[in-house]
């Protein structure tokens, strides 16, 4: 698979020694051994040169040729290979702990602070640089299947635009992702969402289901989003579930476009 991708993207064109495979192994070793920089990685490789050569790192690995390879080679070689490995890992790690048909994903972001003088391209604040990692996480297999990197000042909700929604899969979001136009895109993709509602959600109840309050479910309602613009952004019925988390003494409200799962499952 990797060789085919290298051929597809001309990764080894005019390369004599340091191939794409050598580059991949070097970078994997750097990640697995928690190297802090390319300089740190090269020092370790040079210290164990005979072993590193037999491990497939190639000969005469230098910071210069590794840096040039990272900068100039087509990233699609490694992205496509990573996606291939993720699919294999998902199949091997799959379990049905949720007892729900369909893949369950959680989507959230993390901000990583960086040194402005080094990472000038990731300008965040006056004296600070930073990036934001938007991660789609497969709950069943415990594997991140998609990571989108943006500047740190990009709002979380914008990252929803790059998700390729799978039919009949479930997507879990926190309150930062309440955007009815974007949530409606999930519905039109034949996928499901469960999102924590904001406290000021405008909701017009149509009817309610009976609930057992001893389970923590306060109510299970079906209705429509109220509001001149928001009702146009999400014109279809939506479900609202209120739940009391006894362990954390917290009241939670969820919105979903799934009407088949029990309120407890939501």
Name the predicted role of every residue range:
Residues 1-40, 44, 73, 80-84, ...:
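Single, function-defining residue in the core of a domain
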Residues 48-56, 266:
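Extended, structured, electrostatic nucleic-acid-contact surfaces
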Residues 55-75, 83:
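Major-groove recognition helix of helix-turn-helix-like DNA-binding domains
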């Amino acid at each position: 698979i990797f060789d085919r991708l290298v051929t597809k993207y001309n990764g080894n064109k005019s390369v004599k020694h340091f191939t794409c495979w050598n580059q991949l192994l070097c970078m994997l070793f750097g990640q697995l051994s928690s190297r802090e920089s390319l300089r740190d990685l090269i020092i370790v490789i040079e210290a164990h040169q005979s072993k590193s050569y037999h491990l497939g790192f190639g000969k005469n690995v230098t910071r210069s040729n590794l840096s040039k390879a990272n900068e100039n080679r087509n990233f699609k070689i490694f992205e496509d290979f990573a996606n291939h490995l993720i699919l294999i890992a998902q199949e091997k790690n799959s379990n049905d702990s949720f007892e729900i048909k369909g893949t369950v994903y959680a989507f959230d972001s993390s901000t990583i602070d960086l040194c402005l003088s080094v990472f000038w391209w990731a300008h965040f604040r006056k004296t600070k640089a930073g990036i934001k990692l938007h991660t789609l996480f497969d709950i069943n297999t415990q594997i991140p299947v998609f990571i989108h990197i943006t500047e740190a000042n990009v709002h979380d909700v914008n990252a929803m635009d790059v998700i390729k929604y799978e039919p009949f899969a479930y997507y879990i979001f926190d309150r930062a992702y309440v955007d009815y136009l974007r949530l409606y895109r999930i519905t039109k993709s034949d996928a499901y969402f469960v999102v924590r509602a904001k406290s000021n959600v405008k909701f017009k109840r149509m009817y309610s289901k009976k609930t057992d309050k001893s389970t923590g479910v306060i109510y299970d309602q079906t209705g429509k989003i109220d509001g001149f613009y928001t009702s146009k952004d999400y014109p279809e019925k939506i479900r609202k579930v209120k739940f009391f988390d006894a362990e954390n003494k917290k009241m939670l409200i969820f919105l979903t476009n799934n009407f088949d799962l029990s309120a407890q499952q939501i």
